[in-house]
């Protein structure tokens, strides 16, 4: 994901740039280039952070050998942000999806910098979003990273989803949190394999609305070619049951907008054609993606996405609240993968700000009393006591993808053992029986079939009737289903 040769020198004091729910590895470099070149990138000691649950100041040191290459030998200081989160605007979770190298992270950086001009976000450079060293080295995003920004009418948490095929697992987690998505497609290349897979996954995990950004417009000389790409994108979205003809499509160049904003961070609307495209995109997002109805009246449930251990404070679980409310002092159950146990919430935080209570749709970190890091893992859920139980056997209605949709080329039979992706977990399961539309036992399932199956998972997971899941095998999605009944 080559961006620019413009080097952005990080200041000697960095604030934490990410909320507790994102990937936990933070790095910084003394001269962190925004390019994908092999320029010097010193790696800091990798440290797991979760902002205001930390001591007020956490120091990250460069190793002595790395320090010699730097202009100054002073260590970076990462300070925890403080303060309260105030709900002045509706909160939405959106994200960038699309093929690797089409410009998702560049667009995310351009969005935060453009909205920072209006005083509505903290600007994030490209390399602050693509934070982990292996991502920066390969120029690709692996873990989903989250930033926040505001428009005039809304507050957004923005997930930058990976486009690299190896890391679709993390993209599923990111997509499962979205109220809407910005699909980034290179105007020069058109839709590519991961473009299709991301649209399919967005449909499977229930992303309700999509807005399209046709990137790299500056690289397309022929206006007709851009129109053909737009037509192709609309047809592709329609083929996955999105309203392709109605979806807003904005074309522009995230890179030229980002470079303009880095050269002049005070650029306002009307001063630069490429920056104006970024504002136009957010206008469309504000108009087209509806404010979701949050299920605040239902019992609390949060699927754990990541876990941090903070010395002298305890263990923090992060994730998006699926339903209900939670506040400090609430007792919650820890369900799935292991024996159910309960704990008390001793801290609630979102985007480095303390919350009195958190509600459905919020990306939060919850500090838990008496829980060790080894007791808790991604894929478990935190829930109101007694409202959800772990199960390992269920029946489901499943659609098996055709070869043309990226699915299997051959049928599968009873005894098939793929991976089942549910909320933030993936667990191996065995298909023990297959029934056709008439509830008659069937021997095999062909790509393109819609069948009823019974599944036995190798470990119990917190599941419910009506829950959606994806079936994956060998690095690709082969099916999607809905749980019909819990058996045991």
Swiss-Prot record:
Sequence segments annotated as region (Disordered): 1-20
Q: Where is this region: G5?
A: 253-255
Region described as G3: 160-163
Region of interest (G4), residue spans: 215-218
The UniProt record describes its induction as: Induced by light, low temperature and salicylic acid (SA). Repressed by high salt and abscisic acid (ABA).
Cellular component terms per the entry's GO annotation: chloroplast; mitochondrion
Q: Which Gene3D superfamilies does the UniProt record give?
A: P-loop containing nucleotide triphosphate hydrolases (3.40.50.300), Translation factors (2.40.30.10)
A Gene Ontology MF term for this entry?
Answer: GTPase activity
Q: Name one GO biological process term.
A: mitochondrial translational elongation
Q: Which amino acids does the record list as binding GTP? A: 98-105, 160-164, 215-218
- InterPro entries this protein is in? EF-Tu_GTP-bd (IPR041709), EF-Tu_GTPase (IPR050055), EFTu-like_2 (IPR004161), EFTU_2 (IPR033720), G_TR_CS (IPR031157), P-loop_NTPase (IPR027417), Small_GTP-bd (IPR005225), T_Tr_GTP-bd_dom (IPR000795)
Q: Which UniProt keywords apply?
A: Chloroplast, Elongation factor, GTP-binding, Nucleotide-binding, Plastid, Protein biosynthesis, Transit peptide
Q: Where is the tr-type G domain?
A: 89-293
Q: In which tissues is it expressed?
A: Higher expression in leaves than in roots.
Q: Where is this region: G1?
A: 98-105
Q: What family, per the record? A: Belongs to the TRAFAC class translation factor GTPase superfamily. Classic translation factor GTPase family. EF-Tu/EF-1A subfamily.
What protein am I looking at?
A: Elongation factor Tu, chloroplastic
Organism from which the protein derives: Pisum sativum (Garden pea)
Name the gene behind this protein: tufA
